[in-house]
């Protein structure tokens, strides 16, 4: 099973642990959402697909950026500052909270040996 989770969604825990997070390979997990959009443009993916408002599709009218209260350009810049450049700013607190609160999604299941 191939995942569509990107680095932005992975770091924020913005996926379902045993739903879209259950996979065998994650080819775009290292790419921020805005990087995926850039690559899609290079690959000549139809602009209507690239411009479609990101949504988990959990309910009618649900859109990621409204739920996160930030747009993905801002989110990706902040996440790159934090995780790629170790440059933490006070206004990144909400993103760090999402990262820490979703830590369990990035851990392997515990086993009793």
Locations of the language-model features?
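ATP/NTP-dependent adenylation/nucleotidyl-transfer catalytic domains that generate, transfer
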Residues: 1, 5-113
């Amino acid at each position: 099973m191939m995942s569509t989770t990107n680095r932005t969604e992975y770091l924020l825990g913005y996926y379902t642990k045993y739903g879209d997070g259950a996979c065998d390979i994650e080819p775009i997990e290292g790419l921020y959402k805005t990087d995926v959009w850039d690559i899609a443009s290079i690959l000549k993916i139809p602009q209507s697909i690239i411009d479609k408002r990101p949504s988990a599709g959990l309910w009618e009218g649900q859109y990621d950026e409204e739920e996160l209260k930030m747009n993905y350009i801002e989110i990706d810049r902040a996440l790159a500052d934090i995780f790629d450049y170790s440059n933490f700013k006070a206004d990144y607190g909400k993103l760090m909270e999402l990262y820490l609160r979703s830590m369990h999604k990035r851990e392997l299941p515990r086993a009793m040996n």
